[in-house]
A protein has these predicted regions:
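Domain-level signature for soluble enzymes in the chorismate/prephenate branch of the shikimate pathway
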Residues: 1-174
Length: 174
């Protein structure tokens, strides 16, 4: 079996952008662009093996040695604090962590703040610094629904353009 560099790519837009960077750098894998359900894509000519994984799992594959290289967002590194070496910032998929709420929301500092997020460690750290009592509601998707349906007061989520927030009458809160 040939020696390969194993590269964990995050599924989705970021992964597609990053694969294009590897391809442009001379590490193509034409089969990755085929419409199929393969899990692993190899190019033995350049010694590269790519696999798509859930973004939150990229660092686990690297930390546990299944991948030599992984590309993950800073949000993943901050949330999970994996024991990995951060080589560089690719300056792609630029996003920001944001607290948002319904446009008309007014906070009551004497009341426990209900915070919906898929980043409970980041949210807890932020509100600990604010000395604010919170109740974290951990969700795995559609975080914006939580304040709309009254599940939470605010959300802590990663935002690229903010379009989804504004289209759903949410606004930056803090």
């Amino acid at each position: 079996m040939a020696d390969f560099v194993n590269i964990a790519l995050p599924k989705g837009r970021l992964g597609e952008k990053v694969y294009s960077m590897f391809e442009a750098a001379g590490y193509p894998c034409p089969s990755i662009k085929e419409n199929n359900r393969k899990l692993i894509y190899e190019n033995s000519e350049v010694g590269v093996r790519y696999f798509w994984v859930k973004p939150s799992d990229v660092s686990i594959y690297v930390e546990r040695g299944a991948a030599d290289i992984g590309v993950a967002g800073k949000d993943i590194l901050l949330e999970y604090c994996p024991d990995v070496y951060e080589l560089l910032d690719l300056k792609t998929g630029v996003c920001r962590m944001m607290v948002a709420a319904m446009e008309d929301y007014r906070s009551d500092p004497d009341k426990t703040l209900r915070v919906a997020t898929k980043f409970p460690n980041i949210a807890r750290s932020y509100y600990d610094r604010q000395r604010r009592e919170i109740d974290i509601i951990t969700l795995n998707g559609s975080i914006e629904l939580a304040p709309i349906l009254g599940l939470s007061d605010v959300i802590v989520d990663i935002v690229e353009t903010g379009k989804t927030l504004y289209e759903n009458h949410l606004a930056p809160f803090e």
